[in-house]
Amino acid sequence: MKYFVIALALAVALVCIAESTAYEVNEELENELDDLDDAAWLAVAEELQGLEDFEESRGLFGKLIKKFGRKAISYAVKKARGKH
């Protein structure tokens, strides 16, 4: 009977230790997950901020490309017709 009580006490002690460390691990994992969520949000925010600059530059270069593209097409048409 004495060994049964000792074994039961050891089992209870091991269960208590396992439970207490499980919460610490879960809290660490939740904190890491929160950090990853924050990092992902910051990466998206930086990407969107860079996208605004890209949109501005694309607008400027897009106009220039259209302008030169029209001139190139009209030049090619004139050359094909033999007028140039």
UniProtKB/Swiss-Prot annotation:
Cross-referenced InterPro entries? Latarcin_precursor
Look up and give the organism this protein is from. Answer: Lachesana tarabaevi
UniProt keyword annotations, A-Z = Antibiotic, Antimicrobial, Cytolysis, Fungicide, Hemolysis, Secreted, Signal, Toxin
Instruction: Give a GO biological-process term.
Output: defense response to fungus
GO cellular component term, pick one: extracellular region
Entry comment, domain topic: The mature peptide (59-84) forms alpha-helices which probably disrupt target cell membranes.
Question: Which superkingdom does the taxonomy of this entry point to?
Answer: Eukaryota
Q: Where in the cell is it found?
A: Secreted
Query: Of which family is this protein a member?
Result: Belongs to the cationic peptide 03 (latarcin) family. 02 subfamily.
- Give the protein's function: It has antimicrobial activity against Gram-positive bacteria (A.globiformis VKM Ac-1112 (MIC=0.7 uM), and B.subtilis VKM B-501 (MIC=0.4 uM)), Gram-negative bacteria (E.coli DH5-alpha (MIC=1.0 uM), E.coli MH1 (MIC=0.7 uM), and P.aeruginosa PAO1 (MIC=6.7 uM)), and yeasts (P.pastoris GS115 (MIC=6.7 uM), and S.cerevisiae Y190 (MIC=54 uM)). Also has a strong hemolytic activity against rabbit erythrocytes. Causes paralysis, but is not lethal when injected into insect (M.domestica) larvae.
Record's protein name: M-zodatoxin-Lt2a
Q: Which residues form the propeptide?
A: 23-58
